[in-house]
Amino acid sequence: MKDSDVIVSDITPAPVIPNYAADNLTGIIPGCLLGMPSQRPQWFPQPLQDAERIVLLVIDGLGYEQLQSHAHLAPHLMSLEGRSITTIAPSTTASALTSLVTGASPAEHGIVGYRMDMGDSVMNSLRWWSDTRDLRKVHPPATVQTIPPFVGMSIPVVSRTELEGSAFTEAHLRGSRPCGWRAASSIVAQCTQLIASGEKFVYAYYDGVDKIAHERGFGAYY
């Protein structure tokens, strides 16, 4: 590989400390579900302040800075109103998704990283496995992560069908109503149908960008 083949993205030059009391990932869902439109957090974009029905589309692996540096590839997303907020630490998928849906920091909900020391083993929190065995019976997801997602409400979740019933799904999405998709093109159709049926809040999750970033980095494939 030549130096000219390397794509350098602009990133924050120093670590950012999460501000859990202000404009942070943990405040999104409580702000959407607990407040009336006129009572939502002031850092919410105005369209979200006024919205009576909300679809929260989580694009894993697409941060604000990545979106800015790839703006030409996402003109519709760039046309939407918004700004950067802080995430949690560590900002790995398992911890961040759990913080998003519970409104709690990793220290509070217990999913503190991609791998966790469980005393008798080191557990991959997305797979709920050690190097040798399934840990679902040894460490039940609902006892590892005890905070109810979506402030205790039963919310429709539009995500990959194969994620339904997994231990990590039980840990961070239990009590929700799964609406699985097999092709990403189904996400919009399913969300539209749910809103048309009267749902006030829909949670949708797409992991394709994150997978590409892990496998190929932030270059031409991203």
Language-model-detected regions and their locations in the chain:
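An N-terminal domain-cap segment
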Residues: 36-50
